[in-house]
C-alpha cells in the first residue's frame, strides 16, 4: 500500500513539474534537465539499494524512501519564480535527485518485502506461483497508478496551485509513513550475520 501511495505521488510530481515549468515559459531542453538527476540518482540507488537494505533492513529503507520524498516535495514548494533560470533549474534538479533516490528505495523495499513475506508452503511450486502473482500485481499496478498520478497532478495544479499541491502530497506521504510506523513491525530483510566483535567475545569465553 505504501508503494502504491508513493507511485501516485511520484506520477503527480512529474506532471506538476512538467506543466508548471511549461507554463513559466521554460524551453523543452530546460524542462528535460529538471529530470536528469532524478534518473541518474535512481540508477545509483538501484546499484547500492540492495546492499543498504541488507544492512539496515527493508523497513528502514522504506521509511527512508517515504521521508525523502516528502522532503523533496516540501523543498520544491519553496521554489521562487523570481530566481534566475539557472538557479531555478539547479534547485529543481536537486529536489528531483532526492525524489529519484526515494523512488528506488521505496520500490526496492516493497518488491523485496513481498518476496520475504510470502508464506512457506510444503508445495514449493505453490509458493512460487503466489510469489509470481504478487510481484506481477505490484509491478503491473505501477503503470496504472502512475497514470492516476499524472491526472491527479494536473487536477491539483489547476485546483490548488503549485506549492499547495506539493504540500498536500507531502501530507499524504506523511500519513502513509505514520501508518507504516504503527503497523509494520520487525526488521524485514536485515542481514543476520554475526558481528566480528561478537565472534571474538565468544572465542575468548571458550
What is each of the regions a protein language model found here?
Residues 197-204:
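Conserved small/polar residues in nucleotide/adenosyl-binding loops
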Residues 39-43, 47, 146-147:
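Residue-level signature of mid-helix packing/kink "hotspots" within the transmembrane helices
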Residues 45-57:
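Helix-to-loop junctions at the C-terminal end of transmembrane segments
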Residues 67-85:
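C-terminal ends and interior cores of transmembrane alpha-helices
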Residues 95-140:
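Cytoplasmic helix-loop-helix junction between adjacent transmembrane helices
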Residues 165-181:
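Symmetry-related core transmembrane helices of the 12-TM Major Facilitator Superfamily/SLC fold
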Residues 1-40:
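Helix-loop boundary and gating motifs at the non-cytosolic
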Amino acid at each position: 500500500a505504501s508503494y502504491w501511495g508513493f507511485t501516485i505521488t511520484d506520477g503527480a510530481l512529474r506532471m506538476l513539474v512538467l506543466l508548471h515549468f511549461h507554463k513559466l515559459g521554460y524551453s523543452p531542453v530546460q524542462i528535460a534537465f529538471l529530470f536528469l538527476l532524478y534518473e541518474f540518482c535512481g540508477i545509483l540507488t538501484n546499484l547500492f539499494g540492495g546492499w543498504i537494505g541488507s544492512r539496515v533492513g527493508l523497513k528502514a529503507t522504506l521509511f527512508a524512501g517515504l521521508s525523502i520524498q516528502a522532503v523533496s516535495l516540501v523543498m520544491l514548494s519553496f521554489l521562487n519564480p523570481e530566481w534566475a533560470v539557472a538557479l531555478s533549474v539547479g534547485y529543481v534538479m536537486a529536489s528531483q535527485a532526492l525524489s529519484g533516490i526515494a523512488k528506488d528505495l521505496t520500490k526496492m523495499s516493497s518488491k523485496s518485502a513481498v518476496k520475504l513475506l510470502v508464506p512457506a508452503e510444503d508445495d514449493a511450486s505453490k509458493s512460487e506461483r503466489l510469489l509470481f502473482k504478487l510481484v506481477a500485481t505490484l509491478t503491473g499496478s505501477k503503470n496504472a497508478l502512475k497514470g492516476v498520478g499524472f491526472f491527479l497532478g494536473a487536477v491539483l495544479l489547476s485546483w490548488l496551485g503549485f506549492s499547495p499541491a506539493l504540500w498536500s502530497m507531502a501530507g499524504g506521504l506523511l500519513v502513509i509513513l505514520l501508518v507504516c510506523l504503527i503497523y509494520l513491525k520487525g526488521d524485514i530483510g536485515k542481514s543476520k550475520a554475526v558481528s566480528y566483535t561478537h565472534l571474538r567475545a565468544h572465542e575468548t569465553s571458550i
